[in-house]
Design a protein with these regions (language model features):
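Basic nucleic-acid-binding alpha-helical/helix-turn surface characteristic of O6-alkylguanine DNA
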Residues: 1-120, 168-181
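N-terminal alpha-helical segment
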Residues: 93, 145-146
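Helix-turn-helix DNA-binding helix
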Residues: 121-125
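Major-groove DNA-recognition helix of helix-turn-helix-type DNA-binding domains
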Residues: 131, 137-138
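…primarily DNA-binding HTH/wHTH and HhH modules…
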Residues: 146-181
Length: 181
């Protein structure tokens, strides 16, 4: 792959972005409202990257992301990611999330159990997912709170965006948490 670049691309949920380096995708950016804001977010996150045409492996990943966000089930688990700067705990969490198929969900506690942690680590799992640099490719939106509650989501629109992504994939979540959840 070419050295550090980024590109914007249209999806059914809005204009997204992707940044890449020699070892794979560095990050995915969900829509920020318009091209200017999405581009600015990518430039802040990846100051070493310049806007350019994506190389073939990235174009292939973008096509799969576009299809998934249009409601076509796609497996993105083979998309090459550049794990530089991702901690060991986060990587374990992201690898479990990558294995969740479209239309399915796991709870934060179930992810914690799958990486060998106690249920008390569910909050740590949520924090790791909140730092996910690869949304959609690492489908953090498929991890929900206990009882099917949506839980948080760090992208623009918060839990409403998470619920929209789950609906596109045909998954169910109970909605945003209330004061009593």
């Amino acid at each position: 792959m070419t050295d550090h670049g980024f590109a914007l691309f249209e999806t059914a949920v809005g204009l997204c972005g992707v940044a890449w380096g020699r070892n794979g995708i560095l990050g995915v950016q969900l829509p920020e409202g318009d091209a200017t804001r999405t581009r600015a977010r990518l430039r802040r996150r990846f100051p070493q990257a310049r806007e350019t045409e994506a190389p073939e492996p990235v174009r292939s990943a973008v096509g799969a992301i576009q299809a998934l966000l249009s409601g076509e089930p796609r497996d993105l688990s083979q998309v090459a990611l550049d794990w530089t700067g991702v901690g060991a705990f986060e990587r374990r969490v992201y690898e479990v999330a990558r294995a969740i198929r479209p239309g399915a969900t796991l709870t934060y506690g179930e992810v914690a159990a799958r990486i060998g942690e106690t249920p008390l680590a569910a909050r740590d799992v949520g924090q790791a997912l909140g730092r996910n640099p690869f949304p959609i490719v690492v489908p953090c939106h498929r991890v929900v709170g206990a009882g099917g509650k949506s839980g948080g989501f760090s992208a623009r629109g918060g839990a409403a965006t998470k619920l929209k992504l789950l609906r596109i994939e045909g998954a169910e979540a109970a909605g945003p948490p209330t004061l009593f959840d």
